[in-house]
Amino acid sequence: MQSPVFVMNTNGNRQVGHKAQMSNIQAAKAVADVIRTCLGPRAMLKMLLDPVGSVLLTNDGHAILREIEVAHPAAKSMIELARTQDEEVGDGTTSVIILAGEILAAASPLLDRKIHPVVMIRSFKQALEDALSIIDEITLPVNVDDNAEMFRLIRTCIGTKLVARWSDLMCHLALRAVRTVASTSNGRMEIDIKRYARVEKVPGGEIESSCVLDGVMLNKDVTHPKMRRRIENPRIVLLDCPLEYRKGESQTNIEISKDTDWNRILEIEEEQVKRMCDYIIAVKPDLVITEKGVSDLAQHYLLKANITALRRTRKSDNNRIARACGANIVNRLEDLREKDVGTGCGLFYIDKLGDEYYTFLTGCKNPKACTILLRGPSKDIINEVERNLQDAMAVARNVFFHPKLSPGGGATEMAVSVRLAEKARSIEGVAQWPYRAVADAIEIIPRTLVQNCGANPIKALTELRAKHAEGQHSFGIDGETGRVVDMHEYGVWEPEAVKLQSIKTAIESACLLLRVDDIVSGVRKHSE
């Protein structure tokens, strides 16, 4: 009898077929179970200790999963979903993980019945198309210029977060920041929150004293103590070049034969710095901000001309100042012209917050960049407020691009679930089971909302199903009490973009993991 032939390395860990699929499903369910309690206004907080030793307190799905270390490839894939959701729409990170985990859990008994994964994927894709059209039917348009409607929408996003107590303030901050950085070029709207809406966190004070500055704030002080620290309507010059003696680009050797040569070298250095300052003084600015250094001699010449200087600012800060006050960033002082001077700023002043000095450029006429100043009792709380505010700004930005609202409180998910269950009856053969499984799985969102506020899920879901069967698609769960309420009256709305992206991402990731029938864990070769 022939001995067995080993083609694959026997040291590696390998799972094949049904075992591999069940392993993926178990991993996905485990990740979903971690953040299941983080959904809704009664969400629990997670306390995480990161490798550096600092504590993270949050109920934001993406922030939690980012800190968790997992070994299973399917679990890593699930965590990637939360990142995608956060980058695309900014909200719904917890929902998408719970949905994906539940859809895969619903696929588990179907695999046990020996239904082929390809048949299931076909039904899942059909269910996805139908779900997207159902969401489109029950959405309402929103007027992005109406502050009351926008506030109601953003309040829903942050109602489940730590900052729910200060929801009016956060709505105001998020909406004002998004409106400030919105710009239209070539007939196309651009809202770049990441680049032009900077969040500056200063521990101390009260959360209520947080505000949006119509300009820019920097953690900088003037370079010379006698320079002016308050200037009204300043003329601003932005530079990307040093105000110091330009040394040789590479190593330079100079041979000195007389002592006068040495003095002449020093004079040349001074002349060069003076020439640089003369170029600046010629356009009569009040404030010079450079990304590079400013020498003591340059400070002296600028001080004599009554010009204030700031040095070593970040490139991103310089870009935001340029957007806020209308200045152009100059790379060579020889090219500095009157048109490069920014005159859009109303007030420049330096103020002390806590132990640090900060530069404020405020009162800008038409700022296309802003700074959000966050205050709070501790670093941990301010970090969580910042995460919540980023979500709120992302939601506001999405509504500007996609001005449609879906009812919140699990109403949209229940409407999709009930309508898909009705459609499942008209499907013949084995394909009906996976289709029905998606319908049942999407119901997990309202069920989790009820469970998280300690109410009876069976009673609440039966009542909610009955309302939706009658065609009342705006009924959902009040996340505070677990009662069934009409979202039109209750006023909980979410952007359609968040709902569409959640269901798309969840079903597509479930399809991806179901197609996997072989997991090979490679083992590194041990050095001899």
From Swiss-Prot:
It holds the Pfam family Cpn60_TCP1. The modification Phosphoserine is found at residue 250. Keywords: ATP-binding, Chaperone, Cytoplasm, Disulfide bond, Nucleotide-binding, Phosphoprotein. CDD domains: TCP1_gamma (cd03337). InterPro entries: Chap_CCT_gamma (IPR012719), Chaperone_TCP-1 (IPR017998), Chaperonin_TCP-1_CS (IPR002194), Cpn60/GroEL/TCP-1 (IPR002423), GroEL-like_apical_dom_sf (IPR027409), GROEL-like_equatorial_sf (IPR027413), TCP-1-like_intermed_sf (IPR027410), TCP-1_chaperonin (IPR053374). One of its GO terms (biological process) is protein folding. GO terms for cellular component: chaperonin-containing T-complex; cytoskeleton; cytosol; nucleus. This is T-complex protein 1 subunit gamma. The gene is cct3.
